[in-house]
Design a protein with these regions (language model features):
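Phosphate-handling substructures
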Residues: 63-115, 169-173
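Active-site signature of alpha/beta-hydrolase-fold catalytic machinery across serine-
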Residues: 62, 141, 145
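Generic structural signal for well-ordered alpha-helical scaffold segments
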Residues: 34-38, 114-122
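Active-site-proximal alpha-helix that buttresses catalytic centers in soluble enzyme cores
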Residues: 2-68, 104-107
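Conserved histidine-centered catalytic loops in small-molecule metabolism enzymes
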Residues: 41-71, 173-199
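Acidic, low-complexity terminal tails and accessory targeting/binding regions
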Residues: 2, 75-87, 94-95, 126, ...
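Glycine-rich phosphate-binding loop signature in dinucleotide/nucleotide-binding domains
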Residues: 41-44, 120-128
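Beta-strand elements within well-structured catalytic alpha/beta cores of enzymes
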Residues: 3-8, 49, 127-138
Length: 199
């Protein structure tokens, strides 16, 4: 079996003056990443890949393992903020080709994420665990290959993610949190959600 742990980056600072790619982790985000990475699954990580966005690679650094960045692991490009529809978040799950002006659809994002994760999976040996630090929409886009995703509450960004009839998540994707993907013969056989967030 091979295991890929898809990790949503930890909590960034809130600063609308910075480009989204340059947002660093907040002090709380640093602590939260350390808490997540203290869990057993992360003791057996053999390799780490990260989005090049600062909040992602700053999260990856907390694993204390050398890592590579891959531009394909970046967050979904929202496009022109002036033309962003108020209902965009919900519409994207109704139509996976839906996109804002100059932005990416979930299908666009799924295509590049699938290529990146597929290459990572092919490079792994049985028994290995690889961590991939990326972003919530990018993770969801990839999971659409095997999962159904339903918007439960658009204003709160609450999703129901189902895999072969099993509920993987019914809530928000915490920052940080992880989806543990287990593969047999390079085919996805199970997904589990992992978070240290207190409800």
């Amino acid at each position: 079996m091979k295991t890929i742990v898809l990790i949503r980056h930890s909590e960034p600072i809130k600063d609308r003056t910075l480009p989204t790619a340059l947002l660093p982790l907040s002090e709380r985000g640093i602590i939260m990443a350390q808490e997540l990475f203290s869990l057993d699954i992360f003791r057996s990580v053999n390799a780490v890949y990260s989005s090049p966005y600062q909040r992602a690679f700053s999260t990856a650094e907390k694993l204390c393992v050398c890592f590579s960045t891959d531009y394909r692991l970046r967050e979904r490009e929202l496009g022109n903020p002036q033309t962003l529809d108020a209902d965009f978040w919900e519409h994207q799950y109704e139509n996976h080709d839906y996109k804002n002006s100059d932005g990416e659809s979930l299908n666009d994002t799924r295509e590049r994420m699938t290529l990146a994760v597929g290459e990572i999976l092919s490079s792994m040996r049985d028994g290995e665990t690889t961590a991939v630090v990326t972003h919530a929409a990018a993770i969801c886009a990839f999971l659409l290959n095997e999962c159904s995703i339903e918007v439960v509450n658009a204003s709160e960004k609450i999703r129901r993610i189902m895999h072969h009839g099993n509920t993987v998540l019914n809530g928000k994707i915490a920052a940080p949190s992880a989806f543990i993907l287990n593969f047999e013969n390079d085919r996805l056989c199970s997904i589990n959600y992992l978070s240290t967030e207190k409800n």
